[in-house]
Amino acid sequence: MPSPFPGMDPYLEDDALWPAFHHQLVMCLYQILLPGLVDRYRARVYQRHYDAGDHTEHHEDYVEIRQRSDGRLVTLLDVVSPANKTAPAGREAYLATRRTAGAAGVNLVEIDLVLQGQPMLEYSRDGLPEWDYAVTVTRATQPKRYEIYTATLQKRLPRFRLPLAPDDRDTVVDLQTAFTRCYDQADFAGRIDYRREPPVSPKEGARRRLDEVLRVNKLGGMRGQTSAGYVDPPHQAIALAAYYLWLAKGRPHGRDREHWLRALEQLRGPAGER
């Protein structure tokens, strides 16, 4: 079952889900990247380790793209985690990876799908539309210039251009395709209880957009939902029918039957809502 969100799913920021999501997303990005790389490059998934001060060892995957001929690092693709944006040690670990690559004249691609915490990169948002999620590309040939691809909670995740060596054309990566594959392969639909509130408390603009998506999809604590977040009248009807069968100690009859039929019809809803 797909995510009820058109792009990134903020329920994945849950501490219990993010590590698996981060790993799976990076692996899906890696898989999608491979066909777009010309023969002169190879991609590998690496991992940084650190303790964010909560006595928990954090492991964060990222992708390095290197030239086959000499092994020189060309592009670093990294995914921001909640710990990077909320814990000093996590922030420093992420920025250290970025500084090392930047000093070596490497293209940098940052994927930030985290609502909470402070942005990793500081730049003016004047004249730019509001966004909740961003992919920021920094080319080695223009290290002071950012290419920013954005999305909100109400939009699909963007496609972005991933730079390689200056004499090679960019490869285009569809982040939404990677996310959808990640969500399906890891079966997050079966692991998220959309009846509860999301694990993040975003700022005003993002909160408004989040509330709108929850309202449209009838999520976030609405009564009578399945764990996947959708109203499921047939299953409710079965449960209610079983209840009345138990009350009647057999086949519903008389007033019990009338109550059962009325409740069943209410659960089914008017024609066209089934």
Question: What does each model-identified segment do?
Answer:
Residues G224-R274:
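Intrinsically disordered, low-complexity, basic-enriched segments
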